[in-house]
Amino acid sequence: MLRIDIITIFPEMFRGPFDVSILKKAQDRGFVEIKVHNLRDFTEDKHRTVDDYPYGGGSGMVMKPEPIFKAVKTLRKEKSEVILLSPSGDLFNQKIAEELSKKDHLILICGRYEGVDERVKKIITREISIGDYVLTGGEIPAMVLVDAIVRLIPGVLGDPNSLKEESFQWGILEYPQYTHPREFEGMEVPEILLSGNHKEIRRWRRKEALRKTFLKRPDLLEKVELTQEDLELLEEIKKELREEV
């Protein structure tokens, strides 16, 4: 079972997201144990201070190293992965999520204010960012990591095929999805999906997934290993797009 410990100064932020849906079921069924810890519980002064002014001047407050060190030392096990959520970290992606889902123990440190004291880097194993934008703190990034990681644990999702067909699981975006009704406000479900021809449906889905990726995230096509069929489908897509102009 994976254990995830989250260190934060706002533990109340995690009450809702982890108490519903797949994350709650994963905890109830024993696939993961998630514990949220208030960083102030690891302080030693009467004011429970977790931040201070930066040396050298400047705006904002910096998170102090002492409580973070104490929290990590208290929670750390032999094979713990200690992660600092930070704008300067590695950009989080599906590959990292898969890697972390195979770990036994994760400790997530939620940064805050203008950052954390640089000496905290001494006790972490990696830094992770969820994107090139500014957030108030590391709490929301921690939630993103937990959600992405937990759903990859075998058995968490009811249908194992759901995982195989998701966007990014095979390096490209997912194909378009349709459900009932067959026709809605003049928009119809593609006829191929009603044909019952599973070979042609599979081909259509792969082609549309490649089309969506080519139009919206062409950078992904440079990273994924494409089959000969994929290359042929891409040529078809490019030809169709040229004809539309």
UniProtKB/Swiss-Prot annotation:
The biological process GO terms on file are:
tRNA N1-guanine methylation
Principal location listed in the UniProt entry:
cytoplasm
Write out the catalysed reaction: guanosine(37) in tRNA + S-adenosyl-L-methionine = N(1)-methylguanosine(37) in tRNA + S-adenosyl-L-homocysteine + H(+)
Q: Name one Pfam family in it.
A: tRNA_m1G_MT
Its annotated compartments are:
Cytoplasm
What top-tier enzyme class does this entry carry? Answer: transferase
Does Transmembrane show up as a keyword for this record? no
NCBIfam families in the record, alphabetically? Answer: PRK00026.1, trmD
State the protein's purpose. Answer: Specifically methylates guanosine-37 in various tRNAs.
Q: What is this protein called?
A: tRNA (guanine-N(1)-)-methyltransferase
Question: Native species of this protein?
Answer: Dictyoglomus thermophilum (strain ATCC 35947 / DSM 3960 / H-6-12)
